Amino acid sequence: MSCSSALEKFINSYLNSYQNALSELPRYYPMGVASPCIAQTFDEQSEDAVFWQPVKREPAGDFDNVASALAITLHQDINHFYASFFSAPLQFNSPWGEGELLLAWSLEDFEYLQQNIIGHLLMKQKLKQAPTWFIGVLSDGDTMITVENDTGAVWIEVPGEVPKQQLAPSIAEFITQLSPRITPAIKPVQEVDPQWQHPGIWQRMKLMWRDLTHRSRK
């Protein structure tokens, strides 16, 4: 099964799980950021959670600009995973605990994502480590789920360290080991920094990057 097929299958299972358990779509706090995923009338001034569902991108996006900027060949799965859908983070249960798959909420969020992946790849170069790029986090908030760029294998990675535990030889095989986790919408803590005024998991990624940068300076 391809990465895009595995992701689409998980998304369908995710929506079905919410319908079976709650007879509704999942909810999410967009924090004033519009998205094609929002499945109701949207008020940018409202602080309430909204019903949402993943939306397939037409046409799909790509990371050609990232590859060109860094003069690197990116594994094809980065496009299949990140550029096929707009979506809020997808909560999951797994053999390694609870976690979230990171996806872009909107085109603006996709651009933030690309900037963060560039930053991650540059930091790996600075640390003289093999290139990886992240696709999620585990619930402890201290570990990323990353993809080894050269092979496409999925690993657990602590910011600033070399990945030590391989979870699956590919994203597709990793996703097949996940099950949807039904959870109430959790309102993210707002921060003052205007560069981080987009919703979802990125504020957690910011804290992880602070830790990574601190370690690299030691």
From Swiss-Prot:
Spell out the subcellular localization from the entry: Cell inner membrane
- Bilayer-spanning residue ranges: none
Report membrane topology.
Answer: Peripheral membrane protein
User: Mind listing the UniProt keywords for this protein, alphabetically?
Assistant: Cell inner membrane, Cell membrane, Membrane
Query: Does the record carry rRNA-binding as a key word?
Result: no
Instruction: Kindly give the Gene3D superfamilies that the UniProt entry links to this protein.
Output: Syd protein (3.40.1580.20)
Cellular component GO terms, alphabetical: cytoplasmic side of plasma membrane
UniProt keyword Membrane, yes or no: yes
Superkingdom is Bacteria
User: What task does this protein carry out?
Assistant: Interacts with the SecY protein in vivo. May bind preferentially to an uncomplexed state of SecY, thus functioning either as a chelating agent for excess SecY in the cell or as a regulatory factor that negatively controls the translocase function.
List the HAMAP family: Syd (MF_01104)
User: Which family does the record claim for this protein?
Assistant: Belongs to the Syd family.
Protein name per Swiss-Prot or TrEMBL: Protein Syd
